[in-house]
Amino acid sequence: MEDTGIQRGIWDGDAKAVQQCLTDIFTSVYTTCDIPENAIFGPCVLSHTSLYDSIAFIALKSTDKRTVPYIFRVDTSAANGSSEGLMWLRLVQSARDKEEQNLEAYIKNGQLFYRSLRRIAKDEELLVWYGKELTELLLLCPSRSHNKMNGSSPYTCLECSQRFQFEFPYVAHLRFRCPKRLHSADISPQDEQGGGVGTKDHGGGGGGGKDQQQQQQEAPLGPGPKFCKAGPLHHYPSPSPESSNPSAAAGGSSAKPSTDFHNLARELENSRGGSSCSPAQSLSSGSGSGGGGGHQEAELSPDGIATGGGKGKRKFPEEAAEGGGGAGLVGGRGRFVERPLPASKEDLVCTPQQYRASGSYFGLEENGRLFAPPSPETGEAKRSAFVEVKKAARAASLQEEGTADGAGVASEDQDAGGGGGSSTPAAASPVGAEKLLAPRPGGPLPSRLEGGSPARGSAFTSVPQLGSAGSTSGGGGTGAGAAGGAGGGQGAASDERKSAFSQPARSFSQLSPLVLGQKLGALEPCHPADGVGPTRLYPAAADPLAVKLQGAADLNGGCGSLPSGGGGLPKQSPFLYATAFWPKSSAAAAAAAAAAAAGPLQLQLPSALTLLPPSFTSLCLPAQNWCAKCNASFRMTSDLVYHMRSHHKKEYAMEPLVKRRREEKLKCPICNESFRERHHLSRHMTSHN
C-alpha cells in the first residue's frame, strides 16, 4: 500500500475492519463462466460500521500497483439474487481506469449492486468501479480538468506531489487518502467566504443546475486549500453514542466530522421522488445532512459551505437559529418547505430478485424516475421509509424556527425516525438533551412498520438489536422532525434483508442468558441423543443452573420431533430442565436406542404446571424413575406414577403395527418377559443386577 500517511483516526478501533480490508486488497476474483452484458450481482453485504465497511471500500482498495497473492475463482451464475447477498463481491478488485473496468457499482434499494458493462469472458478478472451516480455522490470526479490544467499525462497530487499512473487511484487518493489534504481540512480556519469553490452558489441550495453540477465536479480539483475542507474522511467516533452525525453541536463544537454515507445515499434516494430536480440540484440543495459544519462539499452541507465552516462553528448565528444549527440548515430546510411532495412515493421498493433481467431497472440519471418498475404488489408496506418524514419535518421546521436560539439547537436532520433511526444531538440545549435520551440502536423504525407488516421498502431502516430494550420506543425521542408520528415502530417487524446502510446488530455478549437461550433455540437443532452439552452451546451463561434451564428451554423449543414445538411452554419456567444430558443406565440406553430404531414415537410435551421439580442430586446417579414419553426423570417412584396419571393417561393410542413392534422390542433379553412401557423394562432390568 503506497499511502503510508493515512490518518490514524481511520485505523483506531477498527482492527477488524482493517483486517477485512487487507484480505480484500490481496484477493482477486476470476469468473469461471461467461458473463453477459448488464448482468447484475448483489447485493454487496455492508454493515456500515466503519469507512472500510461502507460504499467507499472500492475507492480505498484502488492502487496503481496490484499485489494479488490470492485468486478467488467464482461461478458467477450460481446463487445470484439471494437476499443474503454475495460475499465474494467484497473481494473484487478496483479497476484502475475505464479501459480495464468491466463491472459498475450502483445503488438500488439502498444497497450496493454490481452490473457488468460488457460481456466478460471465462477466466477473466472482475474489476469494478463506481457508476456515474456514485461517482458524483462520493465526489470522485473525473480528471479531465486536471489534464487540461496540468497538461501532463501522469496524475500528480497538488498537495503531496504523489504521482499516479492511472485515473481511478488518483481520484481515490484525492478524495480519501491524501494526508496533507486531510490535515489541512483539520487546521484550516473557517473564513474564506469569498474564495474557494462556488460557496454562495452552493449555499443557496437552489441555483442553476448546470453551474452547480460543474462546480460539483470541479470542486476536488481546485488548487487552493479551500476544497480540502471537502474531505473530512477520518472515521472519528461520535460525541454521543446516540448520534449518527458527529458534528451536530452548534456554536463552537470542536467535534471532527465524519463522512456519513448513510445520509448521503438516503438523500439521494429522497431526491429520486421529485421529478423537477436534477441529481446535481438535489444533492447541492441539502444532501449534506450527514455531517454538518464544515462537512465535505462532497456532501454539500449548505451551512458548512455558505459559512465556510471548519469544525461545526456557525458564521451567521441568525441562519443557525433559523435552521436549528444542525446539518442541512438552509438548503435542506428550504427544499423541504418549498418543494411539493412527489407524486409517487413508491421509490426504491423492489427486491433484488424481482428485477434481474437486463434493462428492467432505471438508472439514477433518469431524472426523478423509480429505481424499478412498480409491481402490482407494491403497497403501503413496501414504500419508502422516508415518505412520512417529509411532512413531519415540514411541520416541525415551522415549530422550531420560533424556539431555536443562536447558540444552536440540533437540527432534526430529515432522517429522524427514518434512516439511521437516530436524532442529531445538541450540546447546549435542554431540547437537545431530551433528544439524546432516544435509544438509538434499536431505534424508532419508520411509521411504515407500525402495522406490523414486514417493511420491504427503503433500505435505511435500522436493524433492531437483539434484546434491545429500546426497540419499541415511541417516536417522541427521535428528534423534532419525527414528532409528527414518524417514529414508533416495532423491532419485531423489521426487515430481514441486510441493508448497505443499516446499523449493525448488537453482539450476543450483551444479552442476558435467558434471552440468549431463546434467540439461539431455533437456530440450534437439538435431539435427545445428540449428547451436546449445554455449556458448549451457551458459554456465556454465568451460573450452572441457568445453563441447565437454558439448555432445557432450547431443547423444547428447537426439537422438531415434539408435536407442539415447545410453543405452549413458558421457556423461563424453573421446572424445565435438560434431561437429555442426564446419565442413564446402559440397559436403559440400549432399550431407548432400540425403541428409537423401531419407528417414530408419538411424544407428548408435559404441562409446565404440574411437572414436579427433580432432585439435582440424581445428576450423579443412574436415573431409574424416568418417563419414556417425555424423557422427564423423577427421584421418587410415586412422583413418576403421579406424572404418568396426570400427563399421559389420555394419550391417544398409537397405530397397531407400531404398538406391536414396540412390544416386541420391550422384551427382557434374560427372561424374555415383555413389557408395555420402557421404564417398566428398565426397572425390571435392575432386578437382574
From Swiss-Prot:
Keyword RNA-binding (UniProt): no
Parts of the chain that traverse the membrane: none
Gene3D superfamilies with a match to the protein in the record: Classic Zinc Finger, SET domain
Subcellular location: Nucleus
Cellular component terms (Gene Ontology): nuclear body; nucleoplasm; nucleus
Biased composition (Gly residues): 193-210, 322-333, 472-491
Any GO molecular function: zinc ion binding
Chief place of localization: nucleus
Zn-finger (C2H2-type) residues: 155-183, 625-648, 666-688
Pfam families linked: PRDM2_PR (PF21549), zf-C2H2_4 (PF13894)
Effect of F261L: In EPM10; does not affect interaction with EPM2A and NHLRC1
Sites where the protein binds S-adenosyl-L-methionine: Y130
Region: Disordered, residue numbers: 185-333, 397-506
UniProt note on tissues of expression: Expressed in brain, heart, skeletal muscle, testes, prostate.
InterPro entries from the UniProt entry: PRDM8-like_PR/SET (IPR044402), SET_dom (IPR001214), SET_dom_sf (IPR046341), TR-Histone_Methyltrans (IPR052296), Znf_C2H2_sf (IPR036236), Znf_C2H2_type (IPR013087)
Domain SET: 16-131
EC identifiers of the protein: 2.1.1.-
Residue ranges, compositional bias (Low complexity): 241-258, 273-286, 423-433
Keyword Zinc-finger: yes
GO biological process, one term: corpus callosum morphogenesis
Keywords tagged on the record: Disease variant, DNA-binding, Epilepsy, Metal-binding, Methyltransferase, Neurodegeneration, Neurogenesis, Nucleus, Repeat, S-adenosyl-L-methionine, Transcription, Transcription regulation, Transferase, Zinc, Zinc-finger
Family of the protein in this entry: Belongs to the class V-like SAM-binding methyltransferase superfamily.
Function: Probable histone methyltransferase, preferentially acting on 'Lys-9' of histone H3. Involved in the control of steroidogenesis through transcriptional repression of steroidogenesis marker genes such as CYP17A1 and LHCGR. Forms with BHLHE22 a transcriptional repressor complex controlling genes involved in neural development and neuronal differentiation. In the retina, it is required for rod bipolar and type 2 OFF-cone bipolar cell survival.
Implicated disorder: Epilepsy, progressive myoclonic 10: A form of progressive myoclonic epilepsy, a clinically and genetically heterogeneous group of disorders defined by the combination of action and reflex myoclonus, other types of epileptic seizures, and progressive neurodegeneration and neurocognitive impairment. EPM10 is an autosomal recessive form characterized by progressive dysarthria, myoclonus, ataxia, cognitive decline, psychosis, dementia and spasticity, with onset in childhood. There is variability between patients.
Subunit structure of this chain's protein: Interacts with EPM2A and NHLRC1. This interaction sequesters EPM2A and NHLRC1 to the nucleus. Interacts with BHLHE22.
Designated name of the protein: PR domain zinc finger protein 8
Species per Swiss-Prot/TrEMBL record: Homo sapiens
